[in-house]
């Protein structure tokens, strides 16, 4: 369970975050767009950050944001369901983190690949994935400064982190 540092003070020793980072890195390396560059930053006493830099063929610079840390499992799970083992039931996926914005990396890369497959001209895009959002993102300001040369001057931020009113439809939030 890749719990955020506020909920797992021994996150580094427990190794769950490193495992998730490794799995995410493997997935990105397999599916990332052509000519993209993957950056992984790890600084002592800070959670890691992942940036996928995708060159564009038109003006503009988009930052797509998401996270891969989780809140605690809480209580109230049905007997056949549990927080740490995903289960498909009635065409729905159950498990801790399934609807907790863990999709951001995959949705970002998937949407970029789909647009590229359709021949859509895209600006430069940087996908930024952090690992301490559920703890209030204490490491994000440091990395935003540290990685400024990768992130660049941003024209649009797409934040893949929100809520849902029910499980019957897709929800979008604009702020």
Place the predicted regions along the sequence by residue.
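Short, ordered beta-strand-loop transition motifs
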Residues: 42-45, 87-92, 175
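N-terminal helical capping/dimerization or prosegment-like subdomains
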Residues: 1-75
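Gly/Ser/Thr-rich beta-alpha loop segments that engage phosphate groups in nucleotides
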Residues: 3, 97-99, 138
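Short glycine-rich loop/turn motifs
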Residues: 46-49, 81-83, 169
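Glycine- and other small-residue-rich loops at beta-strand/loop junctions that grip anionic moieties
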Residues: 41, 97, 132
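Acidic/histidine-rich catalytic neighborhood of metal-dependent amide-processing enzymes
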Residues: 101-174
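Active-site metal-coordination/substrate-binding segment of hydrolases
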Residues: 59-129
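Tryptophan-centered motif/residue detector
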Residues: 7-11, 27, 65, 77-80, ...
């Amino acid at each position: 369970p890749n719990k955020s540092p506020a909920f797992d003070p021994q996150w580094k020793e427990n190794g769950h975050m490193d495992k998730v980072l490794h799995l995410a890195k493997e997935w990105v390396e397999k599916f990332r767009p052509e000519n993209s560059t993957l950056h992984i930053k790890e600084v002592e006493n800070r959670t890691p950050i992942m940036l996928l830099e995708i060159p564009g063929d038109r003006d503009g610079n988009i930052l797509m944001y998401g996270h891969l840390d989780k809140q605690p499992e809480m209580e109230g799970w049905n007997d056949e369901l549990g927080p740490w083992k995903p289960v498909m039931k009635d065409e729905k996926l159950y498990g801790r983190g399934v609807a907790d914005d863990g999709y951001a990396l995959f949705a970002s890369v998937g949407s970029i690949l789909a647009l590229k497959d359709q021949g859509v001209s895209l600006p430069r895009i940087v996908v930024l994935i952090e690992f301490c959002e559920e703890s209030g993102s204490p490491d994000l300001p440091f990395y935003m400064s540290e990685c400024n040369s990768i992130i660049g001057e941003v024209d649009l931020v797409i934040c893949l982190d929100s809520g849902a009113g029910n499980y019957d439809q897709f929800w979008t939030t604009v702020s």
